Amino acid sequence: MSQADADITPFFADDNEGEGPVENGVGSPLPEDEEEESPSGVTDRRAIMTVIVLCYINLLNYMDRFTVAGVLPDIEHFFGIGDGTSGLLQTVFICSYMFLAPLFGYLGDRYNRKLIMCVGIFFWSVVTLASSFIGKDHFWALLLTRGLVGVGEASYSTIAPTIIADLFVKEKRTNMLSIFYFAIPVGSGMGYIVGSKVDTVAKDWHWALRVTPGLGLLAVFLLMLVVQEPKRGAIEAHPEHTLHRTSWLADMKALCRNPSFILSTFGFTAVAFVTGSLALWAPAFLFRAGVFTGVKQPCFKAPCDDSDSLIFGAITVVTGILGVASGVQASKLLRTRTPRADPLVCAAGLLLAAPFLYLSIMFAQASTVATYVFIFLGETFLSMNWAIVADILLYVVIPTRRSTAEAFQIVLSHLLGDAISPYLIGVVSDSIKESNSYMWEFRSLQMSLLLCSFVAVAGGAFFLATAVFIEKDRDLAENYVPSDDAPIVVPRSGRSTKVSVSSVLI
């Protein structure tokens, strides 16, 4: 049995063992009335249901991540902390998420992805619930639990896109990825809205962290009931080719020599830097602008004014949907004219977002309406990247390396992006601030947020560079021909040793 036909495996089984119906009369035949399976081993109807479940979990993922941002003023007031310290809440989460991604990427390329996600999401739900019972003298415990939440999210984010890639190809894959990535802005916006409203109703920010755990347990149930593990690469593999696993080191060497993957990852890092900064600090910045101009009252007692979180959350939802949809459609139209369409659309999105983000920050004091209009435009252009970047990764990397590539991209984009940006913005704000007056609280955060516009321009440059290599790298991935894995003799430690071809090839 080929490896492509043997991917529905027990959790700790090797991929050389499979289960389910097989060809040539071996195994149990499918019932005659059952829908015909695709090469992935999953029926079309089950594939659609799988994408729906994965979208639900992705939405829940981002909803949980940004619930904290929706109640950040209350958390700062409750623990008596400043900008630099509160910025750590996002940083510790992203750091654990980032460092665990390679582990789950390695496991996702070799073991049953469905069960890995089930275990990770269950753990994430339990830890999130535990974080909602922390008292005011134990801020370190909140940091610890927010860090542990990254375990569950790393188990999901590195694996889910590769499952979609094994269910669909070409334009249908792009469409499904766009649906999947709609959940990012929608979930983020819902995090702001649900977090702030639950805080207002319950008059305690802790309750905002108790919404997603129950929904997470429902996600585990849906994963077990609905999702079926597809066969890796079977839907797009050439019939005469069998894809072999190579070592993790060989995978990493191959990825590092893939310029389209590396450059698009750096471009996506810029997106992560900007979105991470805005996600945590935009509502707080808008609130401080209102206090400075006298439109809002300062927060002396929780719950604080949540109108900015609600409006920013609604903007995030709408701009995310518009941005992802417009990015995908622009890419489809441009593909008829140039095979470099995807990185060019990503570059345009970042380069157009930069001036509008700059204007939104500078107009915060003068006009609230103008500020929201510029935020709307900036976030719309910024959101054009999500589905397209994922599609680029999937078509320039071969199937047996995709989870590892997802993990590598997560590590780099978070290490230099949203792991550092919230903390960096907070530290710069604290260093600029000359006093604790309302004016300096606003001005210092305003100046530090201007970094986002310049990072967006740098990201656009990386995507323009990606366009130079995209044709060649896509062709190499689509026409990848693995060698026969029969043993060959190589010199090792002064003697001849038989090893498999895949262990020495990159």
UniProtKB/Swiss-Prot annotation:
Q: Name one GO biological process term.
A: lipid transport
MF-aspect GO terms: transmembrane transporter activity
Is the keyword Nucleotide-binding assigned to this protein?
A: no
Q: Where is the composition biased (Low complexity)?
A: 21-30
Topology versus the membrane, per the UniProt entry?
A: Multi-pass membrane protein
Membrane-spanning residues: 52-71, 87-107, 115-135, 149-169, 176-196, 207-227, 266-286, 310-330, 344-364, 373-393, 408-428, 450-470
What family is this protein classified in? Belongs to the major facilitator superfamily. Spinster (TC 2.A.1.49) family.
Record's protein name: Protein spinster homolog 1
- Species of origin reads Danio rerio (Zebrafish)
